[in-house]
Curated annotation (Swiss-Prot):
The lineage of its organism: Eukaryota, Metazoa, Chordata, Craniata, Vertebrata. Belongs to the phospholipase A2 family. Group I subfamily. It comes from Austrelaps superbus (Lowland copperhead snake). This is Phospholipase A2 superbin c. One of its GO terms (cellular component) is extracellular region. Keywords: Calcium, Disulfide bond, Hemostasis impairing toxin, Hydrolase, Lipid degradation, Lipid metabolism, Metal-binding, Platelet aggregation inhibiting toxin, Secreted, Toxin.
Amino acid sequence: NLIQLSNMIKCAIPGSRPLLHYTDYGCYCGKGGSGTPVDELDRCCK
């Protein structure tokens, strides 16, 4: 889910703010989701 993804990114990139940057990323990172994922990151949010 998005919270887990956020925590992984924060661990890998300290000081980052992933929820601000990835909330509406691609087709699945954010609220809802449909269609074909645009890349591996979007696929992870699925």
